[in-house]
Amino acid sequence: MKRRQLFAGVAGLAASTLLLAACGTGPNPASAPTPTEDPSGSITFWSSLAGMDKVAAAFNASQDKIKVTFETIPNGANGGYAKLSTAITAGNGPDVSTIEYPQLPQFVSNGQVVPLDGLIDKPASVDKLTDETKALVQFGDNTFGLPYDAAPMVMWYRKDMLAKAGVDVPKTWDEFEEAGKKLQAAQPGAYLASFNPNEVAASAGLAWQAGAKWFGTEGDSWKVGVNDAATQKVATYWQKLIDEKIVKVSQAYSDEWSLDLANGTVVGVVGANWSATGIQKRTEASGQKGQWIAAELPNWGSDAGAFYGGSSFNVTKSSKNPAAAAKFVEFLTTNPEAIKARGNTGSAFLAFPGLTPVAQQAYDASYFGNDIYGVFSKAYGTITPGWQWGPNWDSTNTALKDAYGKLTTGGTIREAVDTAQHATVAGLKQSGLSVTE
């Protein structure tokens, strides 16, 4: 089934999608203003991403028609999305917003971002994207943002610790388990990686890689599979790793997690391209330069991958100048000068063709023991097609986090995904949507 078919309108409206049907309202692309060829005016831009103030300044310096005023907001987990949603609802939100891919369908379903079709030069932007990156921002025939980064999920390892255990970088999940056992034997008390209860998007990525489809449609109904067969396989596998003490349950980015990386208690990270900066920050003082390497995810028998994280830029319903806002969104996501202006703010891997080398040049990767960007590129080429995010990610995310909180007191990952399945279905039904399981 083509992606556009997955979002066919439940109310029979040709331009509608199941997302927009969630609330019964939404932006009508037919009524969106057609931009002038050279839009002008003042716009506002909100983002929690580091360095975006520099990008806004570079855009302002590059032309004199549009003036961007930038405001830093907290990231989504720390209230950024609540602030954004409240402001848009009140009619005083920014012209341009930053929304991560799992959360975007929720903003679309609430009618809080507008389609960019007719506002952007699609042949020069959207049409140059891969199908996998288009799928992150397109619903039905409409484009509700332009993707900034396309974050391939990867593993990070201490190569010196693998060498001490006498193991190569695992290529399959079976090999990963065996590597963990050998690490235990060589270095008692060491863990090959950690399972992070607060990183639900990582669980989604691991399930995605295995072929899971947490959201889809069946006729005019949403089909929810947060505990589908592929997810159950992944849940059972990782529970086994926890039980065998191959991986440690710990909150990502916590003091405990950071100390475990610094002192060698945990020698691997389930992450993405953007993990590089955090790993370096937590391990550099321990003399680990040159020891950390990136690697493609172990697989289930054939090459497969997933995205983990990443953000889009969008024009909000609040915008009084959507043409100028869309012009700025194009600059943010397709112009090399935007990447240069942001500078060395992390190991970005970008969605638009040709921009990643610019980001790579700005980032100093000498801390790492292999060609990390080469690994990112390989992982990006294995993304499993067919994944889509649903319109109530908050329900799924909260339910999984809460259930994962019981993993150290007898709860299991399998129980957690079952709980999240029920919570997700209940949330969709509460929104007035038809749901099948």
Residue ranges and their predicted role:
Residues 163, 380-437:
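Conserved C-terminal helix/tail region of periplasmic/extracytoplasmic solute-binding proteins
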